[in-house]
């Protein structure tokens, strides 16, 4: 490991690579990735409100891409606004007043007027998946293993469930290659479902195919009026659609079987 001008040697029985989308560990392990470019950039910033947000999160689907606002402390919200790259560049370059006016037009007045906005950044949106997430003694988790579009806000939650499952596998099976094989089997369904859901939402809400607008509206109407469908979607989004790690259920780790 490089530390300034020095090189430090660290020995470990297991390396958990959680070093993000552009994982250097993945590069050093010479492992492949599958990349899908969504041809969108995400604008991120903190936005201040004039009235309380009530700890509610919001998402709007605009013609250019989804716009999400997540509650923070002191009546601030974290903004993630996906847009076409050229439009994102234009929005980032606006002064604060003009940016807030554009945001207000896109989002509406459900939260009242936006009062201020912090420094804005943008980054390209892409799906990055590792077909092989382990190479003993290394295991990849979170964005290093699977970077998703932020449309459903599930990337961070998915990474937490990776860690919860890995901790439980280590607790019950020790540090060995067979433990990592077991971990991969446990995580496969959850990762596949959330990846499919996220990618499907992007195609659904960005497609310009004839009749797709009607299909979107009917789908949202069904989701809003059929509790069983809404509950099923929420269950998968929370990680309860398959085998759920104990830590996700707030159960302390044990040495019993997890299968």
Regions found by a protein language model. Give the residues of each.
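Conserved FAD-binding catalytic core of PHBH/FMO-like flavoproteins
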Residues: 2-120
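A generic short alpha-helical patch detector that favors 3-5-residue windows
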Residues: 35, 71, 133, 158, ...
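C-terminal helical "tail/cap" subdomain of flavin- and related membrane-associated enzymes
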Residues: 168-259
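Hydrophobic/aromatic residues within well-ordered alpha-helical segments
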Residues: 73, 95, 99, 103, ...
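A structural signal for well-ordered alpha-helical scaffolds and beta->alpha junctions
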Residues: 18, 22, 40, 62-63, ...
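Hydrophobic side chains within alpha-helical segments
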Residues: 44, 157, 164-165, 193, ...
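FAD/FMN-dependent oxidoreductases across multiple families
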Residues: 87-177
């Amino acid at each position: 490991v490089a530390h300034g001008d020095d090189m430090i040697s660290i020995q470990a029985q297991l390396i958990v690579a959680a070093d993000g989308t552009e994982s250097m560990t993945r590069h050093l392990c010479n492992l492949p990735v599958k990349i899908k470019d969504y041809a969108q950039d995400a604008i991120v910033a903190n936005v201040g409100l004039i009235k309380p947000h009530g700890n509610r999160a919001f998402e709007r689907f605009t013609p250019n891409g989804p716009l999400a606002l997540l509650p923070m402390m002191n009546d601030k919200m974290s903004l993630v606004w996906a847009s076409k790259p050229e439009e994102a560049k234009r929005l980032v370059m606006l002064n604060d007043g003009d940016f807030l006016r554009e945001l207000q037009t896109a989002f509406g007045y459900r939260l009242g007027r936006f009062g201020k906005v912090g420094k804005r950044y943008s980054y390209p949106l892409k799906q990055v998946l590792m077909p092989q997430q382990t190479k003993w003694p290394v295991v990849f988790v979170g964005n290093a293993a699977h970077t998703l579009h932020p449309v459903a806000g599930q990337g961070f939650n998915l990474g937490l469930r990776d860690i919860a499952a890995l901790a439980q596998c280590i607790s019950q099976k020790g540090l060995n290659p067979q433990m990592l094989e077991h971990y991969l089997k446990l995580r496969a369904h959850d990762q596949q479902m959330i990846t499919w859901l996220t990618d499907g939402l992007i195609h659904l809400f960005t497609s310009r195919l004839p009749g797709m607008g009607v299909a979107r509206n009917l789908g949202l109407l069904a989701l809003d009026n059929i509790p069983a469908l809404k509950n099923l979607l929420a269950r998968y989004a929370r990680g309860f659609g398959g085998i759920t790690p104990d830590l996700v259920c707030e159960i302390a780790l044990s040495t019993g079987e997890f299968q």
